[in-house]
Amino acid sequence: MSVGRIRYDWHKAEIRAVYDTPLLELIYQAASVHRQFHNPKQIQVCKLISIKTGACPEDCSYCAQSSRYQTEVKPQALLDKQTVVEIAQNAKQKGVSRVCMGAAWREVRDNSQFDRVLEMVKDVTDMGLEVCCTLGMLTSEQAKKLETAGLYAYNHNLDTSSDYYSTIITTRTYGDRLNTIENVRQTNVTVCSGGILGLGESIDDRVAMLQTLATLNPHPESVPINILSQVEGTPLEDQPDVPVWDVVRMIATARIVMPTSDVRLSAGRARLSQVEQAFCFMAGANSIFSSDDNKMLTVTTPCPDYDADQEMLNLLGLEMRPPSQRPQPVVMGNS
């Protein structure tokens, strides 16, 4: 099987064969693809701002923000615009090129809160930063409003395969997620979509999720690979840790089947050592979340701080990527 070609007709068996490639050979192939399509010295550093925290009505089994579980998360109302702008300004000074605004909503509603989010998007975009939002389900009209406000990307993760999905979430369907992604794809806003490792899924579930993403034309602009952090009070609090080599395999496979996408080493990164993260970067990860306040990610896991990340990047000979230093996705035929 040749690698390094952009294609949208991946079969599960092909992706499984990539995933099962002997580890060092897999890393080598993924690194080769990465160097073909990306600057291997650059890492995009992102900042997540939880603009509305907790009290989510959904039952995602991994999430501490669900109102159905007894966790330590304290609900927080929608932040005011000035607070968000100040956080974004500080992040930009640290070298961050993308700000992701997350709200614990099931879906976006056409009300004053959405209007406030649109203002946040516009103001932070005007600072020269890429802005990504993750707000739940989205209609086509709402996607167009976000596009008009200047939104660069919309995050809506698949989480896992369509077959395993109902084991983890029952309050929205897999089809609901795909519909939101399609609504975004009808605009010039790019798609950010990935999944979570450690939910109890099989390797075939991981492969199936990647196939769903890799058969989108164009591929998602970015693909977050999250590692489950077992949050006390959630149904998945006793799940075993994901082996780091599973994370590396998933990153490498995503890099090979979606060569132009950013592969984001996302939630759960704080548990990885610098050596383990270096293997992830070798395998094709080229984006991370960083913070100066140890605030939680959307799955409520601590995020490494800017200083530690800058030290690591310096050690590895890597640098922070400026905003929008990558081409916009284009629709192509299979080659």
Curated annotation (Swiss-Prot):
Gene Ontology molecular function: any one: 2 iron, 2 sulfur cluster binding
Reactions it catalyzes: (4R,5S)-dethiobiotin + (sulfur carrier)-SH + 2 reduced [2Fe-2S]-[ferredoxin] + 2 S-adenosyl-L-methionine = (sulfur carrier)-H + biotin + 2 5'-deoxyadenosine + 2 L-methionine + 2 oxidized [2Fe-2S]-[ferredoxin]
Pfam families: BATS, Radical_SAM
Enzyme Commission number(s) from the entry: 2.8.1.6
Ranges of residues in domain Radical SAM core: 41-269
CDD domains cross-referenced by the UniProt entry: Radical_SAM (cd01335)
UniProt name for this protein: Biotin synthase
Cofactor(s) needed for function: [4Fe-4S] cluster; [2Fe-2S] cluster
Binding-site residues for [2Fe-2S] cluster, renumbered to this chain: C100, C132, C192, R264
InterPro entries registered for this protein in UniProt: Aldolase_TIM (IPR013785), BATS_dom (IPR010722), Biotin_synth/BioAB (IPR002684), Biotin_synthase (IPR024177), Elp3/MiaA/NifB-like_rSAM (IPR006638), rSAM (IPR007197)
Coiled coil: none
Binding positions ([4Fe-4S] cluster): C56, C60, C63
Gene Ontology biological-process annotations: biotin biosynthetic process
Role, per record: Catalyzes the conversion of dethiobiotin (DTB) to biotin by the insertion of a sulfur atom into dethiobiotin via a radical-based mechanism.
PANTHER family: BIOTIN SYNTHASE, BIOTIN SYNTHASE, MITOCHONDRIAL
Cofactor note: Binds 1 [4Fe-4S] cluster. The cluster is coordinated with 3 cysteines and an exchangeable S-adenosyl-L-methionine.
Family: Belongs to the radical SAM superfamily. Biotin synthase family.
HAMAP family: BioB
Subunit text: Homodimer.
Pathway linked to the protein: Cofactor biosynthesis; biotin biosynthesis; biotin from 7,8-diaminononanoate: step 2/2
Chain's gene name: bioB
Keywords tagged on the record: 2Fe-2S, 4Fe-4S, Biotin biosynthesis, Iron, Iron-sulfur, Metal-binding, S-adenosyl-L-methionine, Transferase
